[in-house]
Amino acid sequence: MIKLMPHTLLVAFSVMMFQTKAQEAKTNSFSLQQSIDYAYKNSPNYLNAENDVLMAKYKRKEVLGMAMPQIGTSVDMKNFMKIPTSVLPNFVAPASYSGSIGALQQAGLPVVADPARLDQNNYPEIAANFGTTFQAQASASASLLVFSADYLIGLKATKEYISLMNINVTRSKVDLVSQVSKAYYSVLVNKERIQLLNANITKLEKLLNDTRAFNKQGFVEQIDVDRLEVAFNNLITEQQKVVRLISLSENVLKFQMGYTGQDNLVLTDSLSITDNSEITVTKTDATKRSEYQLLEVQQRLNTINVKRLKFGYLPTLVAYSSFSYSGQRNDLKYFTKEHVWYPTALLGGTLSLSIFDGFQRHYKIQQAKLDFKKGENTLRNLQLAIELEGASAAVNYNNAVASLQVQKRNLDLSKNIYTVSQKKYEQGVGSNLEVINAQTSLKESEINYFNAVYDMLVYKVDYLKATGNLVK
């Protein structure tokens, strides 16, 4: 009985352990579309983009509230532990002196008044405490923005801002579909690679074991065994690399989907290359791209900004009113019948109009107009860039399709060469070295083929994204 090599046993043991853990862990099945739908609900970046739309809508409602009556109430209570002191001119002493002189004169007595004593400035000021220990006031006020050009323009800007955030959601959706699709294809391609590698390992291992048996019987040299063992070890190393690559690509897919669970992912779509016809290079419609749409909205906002500055010359009118009750006491008996509350009411309005600002607003308008012109140039440049990107994406895809066709043909030829060389060797009419060379060529053809498959799939996603057709 032919013994398996130690590293073969190690790989087999690792595979069994992996399968055991996989059976213990839960699995979730996803097609490509299901992966995308899952990402819509769980990708943090996409969810933030949707939240930005809600925030923009709430911001518009906030601005709408500025035109509604602003009503407020307040209650104020003060306890003056030291009643405020006021300093007054001494009008009491001159008045008292004048009264005394007048009384003496009325009595018929000869009295001559002193003018200095009639001047209150010749007496020291009087310090007096005015008020009560406790003062309370309850008031209600209301104001209404009757007219403001800034408000009207700002309200229009909030509507455009909502459009901006909606387009940003579309852009995030396109990016998400692109990222999830590429990650999904990466997993599929690597799993196809591992299947072919496993098949090649099985074939080469059988050939190696047979060659060892022939060597023991003296039919082949040890160098023939060594050559096959080197080739076998290289395949095992390649297998381990692809296994790790599958794990990495699955983690990338989970990340793009926003998948936080530890469960295994089972991809239900197969790697079928059916639609691989070349694309006719045509002019890309830039208006279908979210980036172009975002700049269009930005241009509308630039126009609104110019209007806002121009309308800033118009006045702003605000109406307001207030009503209050106040009570002043030396104790806290505020709600007895003998104590009175004193009402105050007012109604007013404020009209604000800028007369001259040193031409500041004029130059702000000129800057805003230049921003609009810069936006036009940026929009035109983006249109040219999108057209170039679409043409480049079509060329890249067509090149990938052509490369895939060549690599598929090379793979078929390599398989045939390997099969023929193996049969010739088993029949004793071929050399061991011929088998090794055929196997090496087959491995390279498989790598090139799967790279071409992945490139074709990725370039197709890039083409659909560049032409604005990735998300319908």
Which role does the model predict for each range below?
Residues E24-N28, S74-A140, S270-S277, S322-L353:
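Small/polar, glycine/serine/threonine/aspartate-rich low-complexity segments that form flexible
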Residues Y58-R60, I167-A286, A400:
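Periplasmic alpha-helical coiled-coil/stalk elements that build and connect Gram-negative outer-membrane
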Residues I36-Y40, V92-Y123, Y259-S322:
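Amphipathic alpha-helical coiled-coil scaffold segments and their short linker/junction regions
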Residues M1-Q33, Y40, F450, M456, ...:
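Bacterial Sec-dependent N-terminal signal peptides
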Residues L47-N51, L64-G65, V146-K173, I223, ...:
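Sec/SRP-type N-terminal targeting helices
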Residues G65, T237-Y259, D412-N469:
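Short segments within alpha-helical structural elements
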Residues A22-T85, G261, L267-T303, V471-K472:
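Bacterial Sec-pathway N-terminal export signals of envelope proteins
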